């Protein structure tokens, strides 16, 4: 009593405390960062190594395996995958959440150093690492185009100056430059001219390497001067290399230009980048795992004027893709939804109370509670994101509940003629324990979420803490500010002998009278109500098993990403044509705003595309509907497939796959994996529950297999090393020398001129100089035949791996897809040597599925414990928790009605319902117990009176929560696919719960009261018919 009086009789102090809470919240709001979702990125580091010309199998065995053995010893590695292709290896290390990315990077560098001695010679550089996830979509893509600059020159400018500057911006993890390669001097050899002059390819290579050196020459000095020695030992341009003497034939000099075409070109001619049908250089910017995407993008945009100032006038720099506008639009939608929810909740209060002064009290309590939460969010290191703002939107219905319960009880005393301050004190004292019970039991629901581990735990923690803090502040406000305002703002009135006869009052009286009549009937037919209650429990179980499930709702971020997979024997020229064809099809779609793409590099038959859609308000279709429409058009392109997927704010794993979900096959036997992967992929492709099925195992690349006759080689004076060196020199784009420039280093690349290597007959023109100086044709000691070869070799851990990626057709849930895959694997009879498991998002989904029921049971158990402690009873908490089955049925039925799968967002809704619907029972049970203790009523009379007396606040709190959640259901625009499942779950659960628990709770109360008396061996009074 004294605690409540302290605030009621000291209004100035109470107002200033509320103002302080509000001011702290406003300050916290201004300091909070903005993000699409809570920070849930796994720390990921990518290690890259190259050996130009090496086959995928060579890269896997000689480069990937030594690095993997060394990197696998690092502590905290969650998953290690690698992919080796022509001339390159990439290893992805995914660490545990609690691993510091900088500490992990130091360990990675130490592991690379330890493996250095085991790596093959001839690598142009040491392996490097980057602190970024290559499977993440770029947060921003910049394009460089020019009418006068070559692609190589543009690439050089982009990588040397722009990428270096952008990489220094806070939050940037990686700037990947694509579309071409660095400038280089290319030496295109003429095999016939070399044969005529008797010059070997090794001789050419050694002559070039010896002619271009960079060594210190020292200095000369006397007593007065010092002269630095400088020579023309470096060759920098093609024109300087052409007259280079590489051989003497009968005393005549043979110059490089006599046997080769020497041009200023690029290191790798098999690269192409485009933006909207124009050749372009792409700068694909990815953030650090722990970085905030909005702050990083803002930092890049702030740097753009400086970047444009340093760019020559001939270059056009444009933003081709930016993830931030849709994120900002989504958050703006949530903020508008929050404002609408607050307005609707206050409207509900006004309709019930029909008093401007009375409505002003919760109208003040709600913003104080919500705004004050921002201060706690800032102190906890949270951000303004979709989930935290949705928590505040839902909190509007919660925080007003406490104020409504206190306000309604005080108003009841005022209507009975009590003085305002006395009514405030008496009313608050009566419901103080009820309000505390409701709030603490609601917060208890979220305790299991706070203890939940893994990605789901990280994702839900911010939501749970934000909502819990809002409820806590609301509890304080409702027991301090609300009674004070009631005592000083509301006026007492004479007791009314007749109920109100106008508007909502008349409707409420009619509802209350109807409820009283129906409740009498129910209390006289308890067995029927018991059957209904047991039926809702059984229906819950059936609906939960039957409802389709997924991990996270598919988002429409306005950005699509696509992977091109062409015939494995396709040439680069043909692949570039496929890229152009696909880009034209997509660019012609009316919903597409911009499209960029690139192909080439180590995987000639693949490419990537990034599509920016028009803003949500300018298109009618969702991202998935656009993908479905484009899939039909893209399927008509022969010889290649483009797999599109909508970019998501959550992407798990480091695999770069051509679809949203992955199923990985592992085996210690590469032969077994290559045998079974095509069978499994074919079977999965036939499943209607899957779409866009594809695999990263590509074993049908065209290969020319050379078989050496070692006896003949020995007789001719040729060794295998010389033969292999010939092939590398001729066809491996071999980097044979380095050109040093002030801003960068460039390579001299040697190969047979493409004009002389158009087909397999080029091998017949190759020759080796033997130990006697004679030119021996390759055909003298080698035979060749066509064969199939892998275009890539993949590992997970130290096992051979193949990942089958898939998307979901419209209307199919992830649970249906995973069940179909597991069923197919069983039917195929896959041997134990080949192991299959879901990876990435699908793996997290399965882990979440296994813990969902445990989480729900843990929440119910926690609430039971808290209520048991508060009521000092084993029985009354069960009565209160009996409200849950009807809410579960309503939520699951609503999801089915709206064709929405049960996702992590829907799980949040179920957890919230556990906290919401029990409030009705708490208000009933509290007043029934008080009536039994102080009024001497029987249990039946007490619960009947409690139900009628608390009917108005129950209706108010339920409608407030319902109208607070309703904007989530009705919201459209950006991010609505995240908000709607939460709103559907809560609204469905509240409607069903309100219809049933008003009747089932009294029946359960009486049942447990009889049970309690029976176990205590006391004679219970007979149930009095009402």
UniProtKB/Swiss-Prot annotation:
Disulfide bonds: none
GO annotations of cellular component type: plasma membrane
Bilayer topology: Multi-pass membrane protein
Domain of life: Bacteria
Spans traversing the lipid bilayer: 15-35, 333-353, 360-380, 387-407, 431-451, 463-483, 528-548, 853-873, 897-917, 953-973, 984-1004
One example GO MF annotation: xenobiotic transmembrane transporter activity
InterPro entries: AcrB_DN_DC_subdom, Acrflvin-R, Multidrug-R_MdtC
Record's subcellular location: Cell inner membrane
Keyword presence, RNA-binding: no
Keywords: Cell inner membrane, Cell membrane, Membrane, Transmembrane, Transmembrane helix, Transport
Quaternary structure and partners: Part of a tripartite efflux system composed of MdtA, MdtB and MdtC. MdtC forms a heteromultimer with MdtB.
Family named by the database record: Belongs to the resistance-nodulation-cell division (RND) (TC 2.A.6) family. MdtC subfamily.
Protein name: Multidrug resistance protein MdtC
Organism of origin: Salmonella enteritidis PT4 (strain P125109)
Gene responsible for this protein: mdtC
